Amino acid sequence: MTQPLFLIGPRGCGKTTVGMALADSLNRRFVDTDQWLQSQLNMTVAEIVEREEWAGFRARETAALEAVTAPSTVIATGGGIILTEFNRHFMQNNGIVVYLCAPVSVLVNRLQAAPEEDLRPTLTGKPLSEEVQEVLEERDALYREVAHIIIDATNEPSQVISEIRSALAQTINC
C-alpha cells in the first residue's frame, strides 16, 4: 500500500506525534501541513492569520495539502483542513483518511500541557476549554464524514499506531 495517509482531527488529538511515529513504523515519509507551510513562508500560523486572515490561511492550507500529497507519505493536517469542501474530497479521493478522535477533556489537557499559543491562534477568543468544545461540536461531523478510519486517540501513541495499523490491514484486505 503506497496511498498517502491523511491524519485529521482537532488540535491536541496527536496528529503530529502519532504521524511521525506511524510514518517511522511504516517506513514512510512524514509531513505536517502546518509545519510545511510555516517553513515555506518563514512565518508561524498566527503570523499568517494575522497578515492574511483565516481565509488566506485556509487557501494556503489547501495549496500545502496538494503540494505534500505523495505516495508513501503520512500527512498530519491542520485541525481546520476539513472546513474546505475541496480538501475533504481531495483527501478522500487521494488517500486513506484517519480521524484521531478524543474527548474535549483529553484535548484540553494535552493543549495545556504543551501550550503553543504563538503557533495556534484562537479561533473564538474564548477560554481554551470552551473553544475546544465549540470547535469540536462544529467539526466532528465533518471529520467523521471524510474519514475512512476512525481511531480513539485517547490512548498512548504506541497503542494508537497499533490500532491504525490494524485498521489499515483490514481496509487493504477488503
From Swiss-Prot:
Pathway it acts in? Metabolic intermediate biosynthesis; chorismate biosynthesis; chorismate from D-erythrose 4-phosphate and phosphoenolpyruvate: step 5/7
* Reactions the enzyme catalyzes: shikimate + ATP = 3-phosphoshikimate + ADP + H(+)
Cellular component terms (Gene Ontology)? cytosol
Record GO terms (molecular function): ATP binding; magnesium ion binding; metal ion binding; shikimate kinase activity
The cofactors required by this protein are:
Mg(2+)
Q: Where does ATP bind?
A: 12-17, 120
> What biological process terms from GO does the record include?
amino acid biosynthetic process; aromatic amino acid family biosynthetic process; chorismate biosynthetic process
Instruction: Specify which residues bind Mg(2+) according to the UniProt entry for this protein.
Output: 16, 32
Keywords, alphabetical: Amino-acid biosynthesis, Aromatic amino acid biosynthesis, ATP-binding, Cytoplasm, Kinase, Magnesium, Metal-binding, Nucleotide-binding, Transferase
Subunit text? Monomer.
Q: What protein does this entry describe?
A: Shikimate kinase 2
Q: Which organism is it from?
A: Escherichia coli (strain K12)
